[in-house]
Amino acid sequence: KIIVNRLARKVEVDSIVVPLPFSSQELSIEDSGSMYVITTPAGLIIKWSHLTGIIDIHFGFRFNLSSYTEGLCGICNEDPDDDLRMQNGTIITNMEDIGLFIESWEIEKSFEVTMRRPVRNCTEHDCSQCIDLLNRRIFIPCHDKVSPEDFCEKMWINYTYFWNYECDALSAYVALCNKFDICIQWRTPDYCSLSCPEGKEYQPCVRPCEARTCLNQWFYGHSSCLNLREDCACKDGTILHRPHSTQCIPEKECACTDSEDQPRTAGEIWNGGIDECALYKCLENGSVIPIEPDCDEEPTPVCEREAEVVMGIIDKWTCCSKEVCGCDATLCEPTIPTCTNGEKLIVGHSPLSCCPQYKCECDPLKCPSISTPECREDQFMIQVQQEEPCCFSPFCVCESCTKPVPLCHDGEFLTVDLNSTHFCCPQYYCVCEPNLCPMPLLNCAEDMNLVKENVFGQCCPTWHCEKDDVCVFQEVSVLNPGQSMIKYLEEDFCYTIECLEEKDNHTGFHTLNFTLVNCSKKCDVHQVYTPSPSDYDCCGTCKNVSCKFHMENGTSVVYVVGSTWHYNCTTYECVKTDEGAIILNYTMVCPPFNETECKMNEGIVKLYNEGCCKICKREERICQKVIIKSVIRKQDCMSQSLINVASCDGKCPSATIYNINIGSHLRFCKCCRENGVRNLSVPLYCSGNGTEIMYTLQEPIDCTCQWN
């Protein structure tokens, strides 16, 4: 049994890894550095790409139909009916059972098998995702050879793996394009990129089947494959060390290869021994020779650490013996302490000694388990030492109180919030009790009153003596704050007297405010003066008896009550109210109108509603003779100017009438056509020979509606 593991780059024969090339009973397997090339006894050549995993099968020169083949590729005998033969000889005829055929040829199952069931097509199922992918500009050069529709129909729609992995689907499409020598550079660093091993770089179109290696560098002939392919190639200046390796090295390092299959440069010396020293050297001609170590005598080191002695060792790189300082544990005399309960013995090392250092450290695992209390939000947990010095128990303690106890003022007493007494810091606050406030000690004069004034944020009120809360005018009239009165003077003048909220510090009463008002007022032409009916207003007002309308040009017009007028598509009306005449307006509303559509349908735009609205009027144009100016051409001859040529244009009547006698519609239709013609001679200038000819055409004498 032969297993080719592409990902691990190894070939097993009967569970034993064999080197390549391998050959047995006309079966050969070789690694070209870029692909496995497998030649079967039947003459089939199978090329399996290392990078993409695409398998390419060719018929070799030795292939013939008499050679027996079997397996997933079927029996190559030009008979498709026996291609689905299982390993036990049974032939599958129902496509629903194709899974049994695949499983019969399966080796040790180490992964999930995806079965292809060709029962879908793009007619009944959605292939738009696949078509959109392949219709990108980068894939257009291949469409003539591999159409997107065929690929999506035969591969994508029946291979559900492609639905979720579009990069693999595109890789399969590009592989088909490569068979026609069409190079498509479709991968980018950000889209479907392929990672190559260190030292290699991705190339979208490679033709040589065999990679250039240290083994074939002198006779490498760029062996060509039948088709292009994607591959990872060594960077410029480097070649592949071995076909089965992924290591790219400079050509100068190809001189030698050691027993571990590692490259060595000319002049390089290395230790090739496993358990003992064996120095080898690479010569310019690629030969590997054993050499003796070249050792220099070194002074004996001075060992200063405790229990450190001089030892002899062999350097694995130079194969030379040398003396170094090493630890001899037999020289140590350790002092091991006795640990108590809750402690454990710790072994440490000091840079000044080879001997171990022993000490006892606390071991929390040896302490008795104690349940952890749940601390409140205003508490935090501390560890309190128990009787054993190494063991601690958790304990909840209070946070420090940041808010001080408030200081209460007159009329207040200190109390605590009962909902906070269980906390570390209870909430204290002062409560106002008016009965605790002291009595006022003021004695007011006879014309003054004792007044209490509550102060915001203060429990007890303040007391003071003040006069009545009024205004006094001329020691006779009394006004409350906010009230006013009028005092008339001669002519058109008067003044108002208002009692303010502010106090007059001189009198103790509220302050009076005096305002002088000139009531002389000139009313407009559409207004009349009306005296004030109120005892609190000095002056009267101008009242509208008609309406004054201002226009956009700056002029104005006066309208009497009851008048209506139109201006800028708005109707105005002068209306009488209790406050005087006012102007009401009503905006005209026009139905929707499409002026462009009207003109396209040969309509005429008309205005109505005082020119504010538009309507489309269509006028029928009857059949008539019209004159058309045009240039007359005949081959290479044409008129030198526009010629007036008569034509017929216009509409004629037509109708469809149901005839009850025959049980169907009769159609009547007249056409606008000529009513007699006449000849019209036109001179034409011919550019070919430079001559002038007379050309005769016909034009209608008159036009009428006539039956067809």
UniProtKB/Swiss-Prot annotation:
Subcellular location: Secreted
InterPro entries linked to this entry: Cys_knot_C, Mucin_vWF_Thrombospondin_sf, Ser_inhib-like_sf, VWF/SSPO/ZAN-like_Cys-rich_dom, VWF_type-D
Pfam family, one: VWD
Glycan-bearing residues: 553
One GO CC annotation: extracellular space
Keyword Nucleotide-binding among record annotations: no
Limits of the VWFD domain: 1-113
Cystine pairings recorded for this chain: 616-672, 637-686, 648-703, 652-705
Positions of the CTCK domain: 616-708
CDD domains, per the entry: TIL
Record keywords: Disulfide bond, Glycoprotein, Secreted
PANTHER family linked to this entry: EXTRACELLULAR MATRIX GLYCOPROTEIN RELATED, HEMOLECTIN, ISOFORM A
Family: Belongs to the otogelin family.
Protein name (database record): Otogelin-like protein
Organism: Pongo abelii
Biological classification of the source: Eukaryota, Metazoa, Chordata, Craniata, Vertebrata
Gene that this polypeptide is encoded by: OTOGL
